[in-house]
């Protein structure tokens, strides 16, 4: 396991996407098949793809939507499970022999590469869903031979069945590997539920493995900028090229790439150094020969049954294994925790050499062969990756690792925390954690919120608070926008954001442009006073949080708007949110949640060149919405006048603030002709076909519900005369879903 460690099987001509001999060895990249268009996406690639909102459909889940993983996990004998995993790690199998008779290094690499796909910009990736089982991750060059690691785990999964998910098992295997080596981890939380098809994720625009040109805009200089939201420098790698940028063995240049990519996984310099040093304390890389390995699992012949990268050299395993093409053994205590990585790194001078497979790596200069062979052969000289030497040569990393050389206990503490963060970064709040090994203390990166320590409000309190809100002088749009701003920061990918904690009143969210800080300055003090007045007079130990008041106020506004439209409804409300503090809020970490656009509020920035309708669907994906829910919410929010800045774009009604289906009625009215605005970018004018008078204005966030055939079909449903009530019901249901997205306590 490494920043890429066992990354890239070699092929016969040793060429990569950039056609550079210096990146030898490289995988024989599968090429896109040329064919006539076969799908709608082939014919109309610019059309927004709404199908992404229906991934992970329960129809593909063999357990159905009622399966309760937490209940199944509660039946697990965790001590027996742990003992079985450790026994597996220490028992070499003939079909894939373990280095030094121990699979610790292999399992650490598997767990790291499962978790290491996480990226901060959209919260995608990570170990939380067992995605490594599926393409493309199961066939990435960086994940070569991890198919064997997962296959080794199958007897454990088979034995414990539904009580342990693949996602938890893959993540825990690395934790167990560290513990059985003598390392004391910071704990472990179960609770990852499996998905049953690949996660919807753009890994890059390159069409060859190991390509870099698109994410860097064709630049290869030292100041090149990695495009967002990507977290890796190279297509098919977890982080960086272990031989250095573009295969050029420059440790300082490698350090630059390491810092950027690990930062995009939410790791600082100390955490990054700890992960590399700790992760390379166990295991080795494999590059026994310059041979052409077979195709990856997705391209392998059927008879290989999901195993790929078949190696024709010697036995194809053991000392004849070819994985990355790098042949590096970091320590002589390969299966035991030690400080030997740093002792070797600083106890030797390093000279550049090549592995038997032709990959750039470093070997200890004038050193004796002191590293035991994993299968009893002649001892080896100490070796390091280019990215390992970066931990010494880079001034910042060097200062950190030199300190750890003399104080290994500090390194152990740093690695324990960094490893726990790596394994759990995409799991969301601790309320989702399961098992007996969850640390008692929360870290700030977990976005902690206080536990409920008081009696909750009841139905009569809720009714009284709603009445106070509606008599406060705040308008329906103000209340709806505030509740939406609080809840819509949620990301279903890494379970961050949401209304719980009321972080809308804290930095950085208080001053996000999308949240209209000037409006918040008017609304929040009023809601805070309502909260304070209630808490000062309530009896029976009852209290209400501002987080609850914000959501309750928005729901009260929706009820009023529906009533004004002729529909008596009750918006379901579940109290139990609490208020976070500024001290428990990592401003820098939360900054990546700031919406650059939000089509639900018709918020966008001038000059934005990314299609608004695609960004709207992406926002809906992060909110875990279906296409019907997206459609109902847009129609309702426009009717309620909840646009950013009070803009009239898409407000196709003469009674804003009333919950009606007017948005759909007027969008589909053929008496209106739409044309791009001559005055405003990203704006369209809706003109009366008879008079030429401008009736409405809109953005792509609005017109996509008339232009996209799937969304238009849904819009037509809500425009029907017999579906006005259905629209109100569907809008309210979708509204409640968004308000409760982060209420994991309600889902247990």
Curated annotation (Swiss-Prot):
Gene behind this chain? katG
- Listed name of the protein: Catalase-peroxidase
Q: How is the protein altered post-translationally, as described in the entry? A: Formation of the three residue Trp-Tyr-Met cross-link is important for the catalase, but not the peroxidase activity of the enzyme.
Cofactor entry? heme b
Enzyme's top EC category: oxidoreductase
Query: What Gene Ontology molecular-function terms does this entry list?
Result: catalase activity; heme binding; metal ion binding
Q: Which InterPro entries match?
A: Catalase_peroxidase (IPR000763), Haem_peroxidase (IPR002016), Haem_peroxidase_sf (IPR010255), Peroxidases_AS (IPR019794), Peroxidases_heam-ligand_BS (IPR019793)
Site Transition state stabilizer: which residues?
A: 109
**Which GO cellular component terms, listed alphabetically, does the Swiss-Prot or TrEMBL entry include?**
cytosol
Q: What does this protein do?
A: Bifunctional enzyme with both catalase and broad-spectrum peroxidase activity.
Read off the NCBIfam families from this record. Answer: cat_per_HPI, PRK15061.1
Disordered as annotated region, ranges: 1-40
Say which family it is in: Belongs to the peroxidase family. Peroxidase/catalase subfamily.
The UniProt subunit note reads as follows: Homodimer or homotetramer.
- Residue location of crosslink Tryptophyl-tyrosyl-methioninium (Trp-Tyr) (with M-265): 112-239
| Enzyme Commission (EC) number | 1.11.1.21
